[in-house]
Structure formats: C-alpha cells, structure tokens
Amino acid sequence: MDRYFFLQDATTVAKLLLGNLLIRKIDKEEIVTRIVETEAYMGITDSACHSYGGKITNRTSAMYRIGGYSYVYIIYGMHYMFNVVTADKNNPQAVLIRSVEPISPLLGEKSILTNGPGKLTKFLNIDLTFNKVDLIGNNELFLQRGLNLDFNIVCSKRININYAQESDINKLWRFYIKDNKFVSRR
C-alpha cells in the first residue's frame, strides 16, 4: 500500500482497510491477519477523537504525522490500541483497527484472541514501541492488499465514546465485514 492510499480521510480509509492484511513479523515468522473491523476518527472537529479541537500532546502527536504512520496508545493502563494515521500532515485523523481475522497457518479459529482492539494488539505483540512507525516499508509491522475484497460492509456507531458530543456519538463511523465471526460486536 502506498502513501497516497493513506492520504484520504479517515472514513474512506476505514472502509478501504477492511479485507486488507495487517502483518506482524516477529523474529523470522510472519503473523498474517485480515482486517475485519475499523472505526474512523475525523480529527479536530470530531469530539470522540483525541485530537479534537486541535489538541496536541505527547500522546496525540502521532496523529499529526502524514497518513501511513501508526498511532499506538494505552488505555486502562493495560490495553494497547493500534491506529493508522490518515490524511495530510497536521490534519490529525486516524483509523482504529478494532478486530482482525487470523490468516496464518496454525492459527486456526481463535476469534477470541483477535476480536477486539486490545486483544489484537496482545496477539500481534504491538506495544508503544510501534507508535509513530511508518507502516510503508516497515518490515516488522505493515499493511498489504488483501486477496478477497468481495464482501458487504456494515456501518454502525462507534463503541465506548460516551464522552463525545451526541452528534458525534451518533455518526456511523464504525465499519465491519458483514457476518464475519471475528468482529468484536454486532
């Protein structure tokens, strides 16, 4: 996937990432997963987004990079969240990867290991060392075009954003592959 792909807005990229591969290389082994659920965070005008109002902190500074970088942060002191930065530099939008489907051989039907944003980062061993990483050309964590992009997409409200303004809570900016058993919530 090239830089241009990630320069689009977060809602566009969130839909386009579905069905594509998130690959983590540990030692010499590749763990291949298929992205099945995402959420878009639209930057300074989205009260559910960490960069709402133009907020820049050490944590949110990753969102101000050019599209194609990672934004990893920790919640509840124990769960890492993996996001893909989108749009132009200083237009802080991102896509949260909520769930993935394991594809690598020997991984089997372990949906309980990857059916949520904290679970997938644990499964793929993604932590803060992967914050602000350029996902284009990286050989430890990267995205790749999927082979089967023929599926229906469900749009729904984002999860756990009750702190946001009602208008943002009601936006249908969560996307997932219909009938995929690895989705965190239906």
UniProtKB/Swiss-Prot annotation:
Gene3D superfamilies: Methylpurine-DNA glycosylase (MPG) (3.10.300.10)
Any Gene Ontology biological process: base-excision repair
InterPro entries: Formyl_transferase-like_C_sf, MPG, MPG_sf
GO molecular function, one term: alkylbase DNA N-glycosylase activity
The keyword NADP is annotated on this UniProt entry: no
EC numbers, comma separated: 3.2.2.-
Main EC class the enzyme belongs to: hydrolase
UniProt record similarity statement: Belongs to the DNA glycosylase MPG family.
Protein name according to UniProt: Putative 3-methyladenine DNA glycosylase
Organism of derivation: Borreliella burgdorferi (strain ATCC 35210 / DSM 4680 / CIP 102532 / B31)
